[in-house]
């Protein structure tokens, strides 16, 4: 199961989807509150716990007891939450969110970052399809989240921008970040029993490794940590081959049943889109 980041949608995985689908059955949902996905309840707080509840419900609907999870940013945090609940056979966490601690200033910094990004995209939204035709424009537009935005196709670039502008929970989530709410950090990591690969992009400008990886490296049992050389926060576009290689190694190396998965439900995956 592939879990995208905040303000994105399932299509962010395009660079690696074909290779993964050729090897596995893949679930690539758009998460609640994001463009093309189910709604996020208006009366619920924006937290990793609530977002993970929604993914668990999807797993139950599909008859999936446990799965291999790949998550980027917010999706990486959700993948770790699912691992805590015993729903993961393995996890590949690409620049996972939630590794900061309340009071260290990172929540408000990230909230301000997304507020600026969305404001900029809203200003140019009407012309996104036209201006994203130029490689130089794509590199400039995505410089905060990837090193090589010019590698994104014009159609995908427009879709990424549209997803950010159309994210229904963006303002609520930004307010939660600015308020430094505890529900946006992840604790109790010692409950994780499955293999976890923590992949930290070398040039992450959203969740810089030196500030966001250390707690995960310390607290996730037997975590394997690697650095994604030459990559930014969304590494699937900067180096799709490297990310695919790491996923295949992690999944193929952990094909046994999850010890925590419900025994009465066969673990499987199902191809799914939005």
Tell what function each PLM region has.
Residues 30, 68, 90-92:
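Residue in the alpha/beta-hydrolase core beta-strand immediately N-terminal to the catalytic nucleophile
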Residues 18, 191-231:
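Conserved loop-alpha-helix segment in the C-terminal half of the alpha/beta-hydrolase fold
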Residues 49-67:
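Conserved acidic catalytic loop of the alpha/beta-hydrolase fold
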Residues 88-126:
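Flexible "cap/lid" loop of the alpha/beta hydrolase fold
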Residues 1-38:
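Conserved HGGG/HGGXW glycine-rich cap/lid loop of the alpha/beta-hydrolase fold
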Residues 71, 75, 79:
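Gly/Ala-rich beta-loop-alpha elbow adjacent to hydrolase catalytic centers
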Residues 220-274:
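Catalytic active-site module of serine/aspartate enzymes centered on a nucleophile-bearing elbow/loop
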Residues 128-190:
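Conserved alpha/beta-hydrolase catalytic His-Asp/Glu region
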